[in-house]
Amino acid sequence: MEIVWIVLLLGAGVIIYNHMYRKKMYREIDRLEAWKIELMNRPVPDELAKVKQLNMTGETEQLFERWRQQWDEIVAVKLPNVEEQLFDTETFLDKYRYRQARKLIGQIEDGLRRLEEEVHQIIDEVNELIGSEEQSRTEIEELRAVHREAKKTLLAYRYTFGAAADLLDVRLTEAEKQFESFAKLTEAGNYLAARGVVQELKQELDSLATMMEEIPALLSECQTSLPAQLAELADGYREMEQSGYILDHLHIERTLAEKQEKIGQCLAMIGELRIEEAKQTVAELKEEIDTLYDLLEKEVLANQYVQTEMPRIGGMLTELAAEAKETSAEAMFVQQSYHLPPSDLEKYRSIEKQMHQLQKRFLLIEDRVAEAKTAYSLLREELEQLVGQIDMMKEEHEQFRLMLQALRKDELIAREKLDDMRKKLSESLRLVQKSRLPGLPEPYALELTEAKNSLQNVAARLEEKPLDMPAVDRALEEAKVSVERLYERTVEMIEQASLAERAIQYGNRYRRRYPAVHKGLEEAEFLFRHYDYEEALRQAVATIESVEPGAFDRVQKLWQADNEDEQ
């Protein structure tokens, strides 16, 4: 019974699915049918009727016939074929041949899409032709007005265009022929070709209008402004030469001749309507002329610099020479009391040598100024270099002078450090005396002797003449290490001795009960009396810890408490 129900349910499902799928396919057919009808109703005939209003000759006639044939084929052949395919699709559906129906629907959709594109293309081309005719008709009248205005301007102001006027005339006459060509193409129905003529004509007239606007200004530059500037430069050059300026290195006369020749080339470019080249050449000429002005101005400013700065630079050298002389005397004095490293002596000799070279160089520049055979710009460069070297030497001289002053300062600092270390050593000895130790261990006594000797060595170094500060600094560093180590060893030794003594006292309570403790403490006392406080502490701690673990911690606490009370 269950199997029967399952079969019935499956059958019902198949029937429902089949019904839904057929319904969906019929909706697809209806959509394609509507698309086909919409294409058939497109206003292509109306658009083609607009073309008939144009001159139906030449290119227009050929295009019209092609579009009409395309549309007739779409309506009479291609759309009926689509209708037949839709009918075949319905037949496949009625026979439940869904796969064939689905495949045919895809083919119909592709075909309608191609027809859609073809119809769009026809309408777009028609609109382009009609729009081209309308736009060309409007623009050609505007261009005629531009052409008339250009001819009037050329006639009225011909003198402002110079040699370019004849070629402008030729170009405007050639433009008239293009107007005639446009009329013939339009009359022959070749509207698209006529449109191309309009575009070319517009480009040509725009170019001529731009030229006619720019040529007068360019001619003014080349015929008036630039030659006037060259003449002004030539006059200025001659005046400066007469005033004593040396300008041979600028080659002004040759450069001015080159600029004059370049102006002639620019005029030729304008006459040939090579306006962009002419504009670039004029811009280059302006920049080059500005450069010439700058070069002459540079010489004037350099002359002012030389006249005003020479005395000041001479004063700088005189002042520096006086300072160097004082430093030389100071260095001689310092050498009697201090040892100067070879590098410092070499530095000072280098400063003296540079000083002589700078003075010699300044005298040479003075001679060249007096001879008046060198350009002021070159003299200025040399003076500026000289000032830079003077500034560098002043800095080196100041550093050397400060180094000499620092030597005395370093000596005072070294003596202060020696006093501090002596106090540190005295503090170590005071701690030893205060602790009332029975004696000093031999290693400690050796360290004490070493520390005293290191301080004596520093004192001896400080009394040497000349004083060698690097050697003093090395001796100070050695003494510092020795004294610091002695102080630390002193504190450690006193602490060990005090703890050893306290541990022995603490262990006395176990002497009678434990022979081993008695023996261990006796050994610790022996070591203590022989100044071996470190071993005495170790022996005492080991002895009391053997009978009372943690005893040394208690000893330390008692010892710390005693120290705090004393403080």
Swiss-Prot record:
It comes from the Bacteria. Signal peptide: none annotated. This is Septation ring formation regulator EzrA. Keywords: Cell cycle, Cell division, Cell membrane, Coiled coil, Membrane, Septation, Transmembrane, Transmembrane helix. One of its GO terms (biological process) is septin ring assembly. Residues 1-2 are extracellular. NCBIfam families: PRK04778.1-7 (NF003413). It is a single-pass membrane protein. Its main location: membrane. Negative regulator of FtsZ ring formation; modulates the frequency and position of FtsZ ring formation. Inhibits FtsZ ring formation at polar sites. Interacts either with FtsZ or with one of its binding partners to promote depolymerization. It is found in: Cell membrane. Residues 22-567 are cytoplasmic. It comes from Geobacillus thermodenitrificans (strain NG80-2). GO terms for cellular component: plasma membrane; septin ring. The chain crosses the membrane at residues 3-21. Belongs to the EzrA family. Residues 97-158, 268-304, 346-497 form a coiled coil. The gene is ezrA. InterPro entries: EzrA. Pfam families: EzrA.
